[in-house]
Amino acid sequence: MPTCTLSLTQQVHGQLQRHLFPGDGKEAAAVLVCTRVPGTRLRLLVRDVIAVPHDKCIRRDAVSLTWPSEYIERAIDLAEPGQLSLILLHSHPGGFAEFSPVDDRSDQEIIPAIFQACGSLHGSAVMLPNGVIFARIYTPNMKMMDVDLVSVVGPDLSFWWNDARSRPISRPMAFTSQMTAELGRLTACVIGVSGTGSIVAEQLCRLGFGRVILIDHDKVETKNLNRILNTTKTDADNTLAKVAVFAGRANQYREHEYVVPVEANVLTRKAVVAAGQADVLFCCVDTLRARSIADLVCKAFLLPLFDVGVAIPTRATTGDGRAIDEATGRIDYVHPAASSLFDRGIYTAANLAAEALAEADPQAHADQVRRGYIDGIPEQAPSVIALNMRAASACVMEFIARGFPFRHDANTRYARTRFMLAEGVEEHEAEDAFHASASPHLARGDEQPLLGLPVLSEGEIE
């Protein structure tokens, strides 16, 4: 598994590529100001970019570049308050897929001076004409380590491996052993391991993800056995944790353990830190609060988010009866620089408050709904495993389409997918159908409190 990674949004990557390759065949430069994700894995996140103007460079040619130190000083001013990391990025217009001797000497001269100003990790990086980025990181004693993976998160997902940077940029073909091999190097996180979540997790395990992190605080109950994979009556009788049960069974699929159970409410520091260790995030929950946390994790840690939900609304019939109105599923793909689940109306401040009130005092919530003070939360009809499987499959297929493109149309047309089985309809909404509000949490990383929520501050009780 990659121990050191660098992530940036597709929007920032496009901005950098346009600046670094203006069309004159000469090198260009920028400074990346990076936060990092909390936890044991070193995941650096590009938060700010200081582009060095071409006309301010002292020298620019096809193989070398000299630029004023004032742009590093500007980056230090941004990095110093949070002790962030700086990565000095430049282009190789000729496509040389290695750090040159000139690059090596430059790092040895400049990076020690940056350490004197701030931070404990800094580095350098190169972008090639095809957009591929490779990077390396230094510690204060100038010990160097390669960045194993550079990931770009947008409508499409790009994973650039340090050991394959000289190869063609084309992605592995979907549904092949090459896809399986790459998945074996990635980590997925599933929030919610119940009806849809257990089916999503099962697919991720069978597809070959190198590590699968499961987050859920609930125990197995008898009523769950008709829809949660890998559970038994014995598990319910002993009220075992859902994540522990699933991990125990799924870890038998391979010679080594790769499924990591995290028995915790998603609104805890333990759960949020665990989610931040992943490369891709799946949200399979039935509460709005949990979805709001997944939304924040996506933004703060620059993770692609796949959210799935199902519902079976009913309608009144004559004689006070009820009938199935629809059996429906929804899959939303959210990337950090795009519209959030909040922007798309999946949850609002009002129904988050209503849900919190319902958890704290169901009677007061019912009374307020009757008085019309707040919007009621629609009661979810019981799920069935066939509907869950349909939705969970669509969710994982959405990930495959983003990471290993096979669609005839652009992925931007599929920000949301809805299927209505009673009507026999599947609908898609494009990204431009939703307004993306600016987020103060974008690439926030480990800034305290985590996700901007005091409850997730260091030292808070889990």
PLM feature spans:
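Conserved beta-strand-loop surface patch within small alpha/beta domains used
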Residues: M1-I87, P93-L157
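Glycine-rich adenosine-cofactor-binding loop
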Residues: T176-K219
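S-adenosyl-L-methionine
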Residues: Y253-R269
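Internal hydrophobic alpha-helix adjacent to the cofactor/substrate pocket in enzyme cavities
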Residues: M389-H408
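A short helix->loop->beta-strand "cap" motif at the edges of active sites that frequently abuts
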Residues: S120-H122, E255-E257, F301-L303
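E1/E1-like adenylate-forming module used to activate ubiquitin-like modifiers
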Residues: L267, V272, Q277-R390, R407, ...
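Glycine-rich phosphate-binding loop and adjoining beta1-alpha1-beta2 segment
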Residues: L214-R254
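N-terminal charged helix/coil linker that caps or initiates catalytic domains
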Residues: P140-A188, Y414, P454-E458
